[in-house]
Amino acid sequence: MKANFGYITPVPLNMELIDISLSKTQKRTPTVIHPQYNIVKIRMFYMRKVKHAGNEFASRLGTILTDFPRIEDIHPFYGDLINVLYDRDHYKLALGHVNAAKNGIEKVSKEFVKLLKFADSLYRCKQLKRAALGRMASAAKKLGKTLEYLEEVRMHMSRLPSIDLSGRTLLVCGFPNVGKSSFVRKISRADVEVQPYPFTTKSLYVGHFDYKYLQWQVIDTPGILDQPLENRNTIEMLSITALAHIKAVVLYFIDLSETCGYSVEEQMDLFNTLNPLLSSNMVIVLSKSDVLGLSGMEDKKAIMSFLEGKKYMEMSCEKEENIDAVKAMACDLLLDERFERKINSERLSEYINRITIVRPKELREKAESFICSREVTEIENEQERYLIPEEYRYDIVPEIVDGKNVADFFDPDIEKKLKEVEEEEEGLLPMYCKTYDVLSPEERALKEEVVAGIERRRIINRLREKKRLPDSWKHRSRNSGGDIAVHVRRDSKTQVAQPPRLPSKKKARFDDKHYYDRKPKHLYRGRK
């Protein structure tokens, strides 16, 4: 079970609550009404505003009531933690005040909606609406101190550590400045502040680590002083609450060197005081063994009688001695205890008879298959397989040097042989590269003439198939020559000569020249 209070919605202050609710009402309801409207429409207009305002106030206050946890519904550890940090009575009174204001606003909304049903004019409806919103705002304004307190509680609760109360847990406790935070930093990933003065840790810190492929959490608690319960402050009560409610292996730290400022007798007395809160799973850690160990004490009769029958181990965080051993001892102790508790539980006894151990069938060993292989009569000598002269065959020469085969460069006559090969190739070159002329000069001239004739006929056929005139010219009459564009063939591209442009109408008014169209309009008008 893990509680996380970061989901709580921020609590608005009283004036913020009024501004939010009234602005939402103004935005989400109609805003224009006239006296000449029907009285039923006027009543519905103002009833809608009063209802919406009441719902806005009630929903905002209801969110506060549902988000904050009820002490009776959460784990006792968190219930006592809220009591220590925020005072249980003050916390419940604040939520009760918010609930009373919510009920009062809902009552005001219903009351004024009923009065608006009997209003007989626009003026009376408006005054009833103002009275309703005023009473709602007054009820919200009275929540000023309460909402401030709840916002502080919310901000503090969101910073509380997330502790898995049913998980595997190690709990570290003891006097201030005995080395608890240093141990937590060594075995986990928690960034706990470590300082040479006492009461450095003022709240609960949670670190996580892995042991035997399981996830573990270690809780660092503030230092505790040996004094009556009613005299303990809030910081000490955090440790007392954790010891009382969290099922874990308790690591009680004792500083034998007394550099923490407290004697060994005081630390043993504190252990006896906390003994009712400690479980049977407990390990006493003798810290700062690099300063003074158990063997270096002069009078160790009292401490030995105290440690009799208890699990203990010396440890030094400065020199990192026995840190893993202490962690392993505590973790194994908790694993054994959890295993025994599950075995002895009544719930398991109902199903223990149904559990069967299933083992896989043992397979018979396969007989070796008969493999027919050739018998090796002699060991071949790798040296004899190479084509190397007898006098060089058994020399110890590497095969590969600098990525090159040594045998390629081993022949002393290689240059002479290369020269002979090149001369032989030069002698064979004329024989293989000789060209033969098959045609005589007369036959070659005749061939060229035939090829030229074929090409000439191909060009003539292509020009014959080409159209002499465009298709658009075939359907034009001879008397419409003024509209025919003049085509000029130049560089095998057809260019269209545009007719001369006529002057604009504005310029024609000031010109003596007159331009007539090819078809006058008055001849084709149809009626004079």
Curated annotation (Swiss-Prot):
GO terms for cellular component: nucleolus. Residues 519-528 have a biased composition (Basic residues). GO terms for biological process: ribosome biogenesis. GO terms for molecular function: GTP binding. Signal peptide: none annotated. The keyword Nucleus applies. Involved in the biogenesis of the 60S ribosomal subunit. This is Nucleolar GTP-binding protein 1. It comes from Encephalitozoon cuniculi (strain GB-M1) (Microsporidian parasite). The gene is NOG1.
